[in-house]
Amino acid sequence: MTTVPQGLLSFACCSSLYGITSNPHSHSRTPGGSSGGDCALFVAGGSTFGTGSDLAGSLRIPASFCGATTLKPTEGRLRTNYTLNGCSGKARLSLGYGFFTKTVDEQIFLLKILLGSAEYHELVPHQPLFPLNGNKLTVANSRHLRIGYFVEDGFMKPVPACSRVVVQTVEKLRELGHELVLFHLPDPEHAASLFYRGILPYGREQLLQIYANEVIPPLLRTFVFLLKLPLLLCSIISYVLSFISTPLSIVSGSYIRNLQDLQITQKLTDQYIEKEFFIIYLQFTEQWKTFELDALICPAFAVPAVPHAYPSRLGTCAFATGLFNLLDFPAGIVPTGTVNSDDDRLLADEAFWHTGIDFALKILRDAARDSAGLPVAVQVATLPLEEEKCLSVMKEIEKVWRK
């Protein structure tokens, strides 16, 4: 029996009804979330494919933790009926629906069936007929691509295993003749602040209502406790943490200020988010166009699958996937082997993987210890509505890693 995180918005996959769902590769580790239950079931052989949604990485985190392939489409490319729409308001983070599969070809097979189906259009009338373009699915085979990459996003440093596979993927693609260009994420700390504010545009109250009068699983109690902290106290904590850990400071202080005024009308909320989002979006896309990129490769997540007790303390990691919900870019996960003993050794080496006094990095190191043998992956992103190109690059990466 598998489950999803109670209340969602967590990669601690547990609930008070069904207990804890474990990673198929190690029962001491989480499969991720919030679509972790279906991914774990699929990877364990319980289904031929899995399904899920993705508001901040809920497809991509489980896929990277469990060794599955997935794609978060642009919002609107694949729609569903009778599901929650994520955070309220038109300026919320983009929500995508997708599948867990073993290969990229299986992703293409399932998307072709749905996106070109008149029957599907009848079931979901607000879904336009937007079939996959077969010619664009082979773009990586037909010409050499110009692909951007980054090993660190400038907000949360990934552990050695997660950065290693990006570097190796870049080398493998260069051997095939593709051009790889180092990409610098513009203003990552500001983008991260906007992302964390965007998760809960109405403040913590919206999510706390979900937990009200419910039995809270032990693994989520820290998360719920943090949600209950007064905003003034969060501001003070954020200031103190700014001298110790920038990521923790940003996460602690990223709430919508003047909340009572913002709650008066939805319009004020949307204007607040969209104004700053537009600046980040322009900076990102302008750099993309300057480099004439076809796609972008980066770490799938900052860490492989972690022990069950850690997700509530690793909220700083969510930006790795949430960035592409903020931008509404299609983003996919491709498995790239497993963590090795050298990765574990380098993680423990302070001279190589420096943490200093940064609490966030110290927690990350503790969470990632002894991960040898666990799946690791890379993430591929393209501009909005270029799912075909994203899938094509994913297939190219899959090919070089399976040689």
For each feature predicted by the language model, list its residue ranges.
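Glycine-rich, small-residue loops and helix-cap segments
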Residues: 48, 163, 167, 180, ...
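Charged, often glycine-rich, active-site loop that binds/positions anionic groups
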Residues: 14-19, 192-206, 346-350, 354
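Short, well-ordered beta-to-alpha junction loops that form the rim of enzyme active sites
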Residues: 3, 152, 298-302
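Short glycine/serine-rich loop segments
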Residues: 1-114, 327-335, 377
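A short helix-breaking turn/cap at a secondary-structure junction
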Residues: 69-170, 176, 183-187, 358-360, ...
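Flexible loop/turn segments at secondary-structure boundaries
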Residues: 5-9, 57-60, 154-158, 189-191, ...
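Short acidic, glycine/serine/threonine-rich loops at helix termini
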Residues: 9-13, 60-65, 82-84, 93, ...
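Acidic carboxylate-rich catalytic motifs and surrounding loops in phosphoryl-/glycosyl-chemistry enzymes
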Residues: 2-4, 182-190, 335-338
